[in-house]
Amino acid sequence: MDGNDNVTLLFAPLLRDNYTLAPNASSLGPGTDLALAPASSAGPGPGLSLGPGPSFGFSPGPTPTPEPTTSGLAGGAASHGPSPFPRPWAPHALPFWDTPLNHGLNVFVGAALCITMLGLGCTVDVNHFGAHVRRPVGALLAALCQFGLLPLLAFLLALAFKLDEVAAVAVLLCGCCPGGNLSNLMSLLVDGDMNLSIIMTISSTLLALVLMPLCLWIYSWAWINTPIVQLLPLGTVTLTLCSTLIPIGLGVFIRYKYSRVADYIVKVSLWSLLVTLVVLFIMTGTMLGPELLASIPAAVYVIAIFMPLAGYASGYGLATLFHLPPNCKRTVCLETGSQNVQLCTAILKLAFPPQFIGSMYMFPLLYALFQSAEAGIFVLIYKMYGSEMLHKRDPLDEDEDTDISYKKLKEEEMADTSYGTVKAENIIMMETAQTSL
């Protein structure tokens, strides 16, 4: 009996399975066909034999003893034409986690994560990093937003919509992830504080080494009696996060030594966001198929729409509470709602058994779709209305300048030039004094 196609009880409802009668005829176990082989012909009495093919036959014997059949599609021992009974189970196909497409997808997800983290490291300027370490406002905001607001929001949404344990773990994992490069791009488009955006993204990524497994452990207690939470691979999650430090460190080194190359890598990593999402949607949809995609509950789609929107709103409210300037409010808003979906996808793909996650592997992709669409709407509204209102100023005199340092510099220059001014009357008086001497 081949056990390669066996799946766990949790994932069994999503897959078709075949069963075969065991040789001792006392237990029904998983297998590749359904067979009652013909017994020996010792003694009178008919014995019914059903083979996997489209036929049936009778063989003599007082007490039929079932044996494993070796017949193929040809039927039983005494085939007499096609059987009037339809075959209840078709030959079992490979599960999606054993297909070559899934193995290729694993490689693609790992490569996309490395490119993203390399680009993230290339945004770090070592000369400016020390100032943020001495005044860690950005790091504190990142910790509060990414590991305070978002995990709590994901936990409350999972409880409110009564998600099962698999969907709840996928939502929690996405909510506990750090910020991604999308927030840096969107902050640039809304004239945000880029230094704050970069330091929040970097800080949340580094803090995720400790806080992400901690948040998963805290908020998963609501489903502690379920198999997937009992087998929650916190060590593998931490190891995956640690592996992201290598491309980040390489990116910091490239920025320090070769700044022009770092600028090129940042552009490539930003454009790779779009390519990664498109390829992941196509490959995952092809691999899972319509049956598994249809098994995603409607509540998961609602959470994927509402969760980034609530993250943007809570981030803006937190920045308002701290009385930050408008450009910093927009930055914190985008940093809170934008998650590193490449990291979330990689953890779901590489750390969890695929038979446990199933179609919930699609949740971070759905989240990425809606977080990008909602952030794009926010940028569009800002470009149409917000930029004009924020840059509107009162009419000033021609000589009036709002830059205090520049005004002071002009006053000093005017004072310096007055010291060197020589008038014609003074020249005549000096010449008269010299001739009298």
UniProtKB/Swiss-Prot annotation:
GO molecular function terms noted in the UniProt entry: bile acid:sodium symporter activity
Post-translational modifications reported in the UniProt record: Activated following N-terminal proteolytic cleavage by thrombin and/or proteases.
S-S bridge residues: none
Main location: membrane
Cytoplasmic side: 125-140, 219-233, 289-291, 382-437
Role played: Transporter for bile acids.
Protein's UniProt name: Sodium/bile acid cotransporter 4
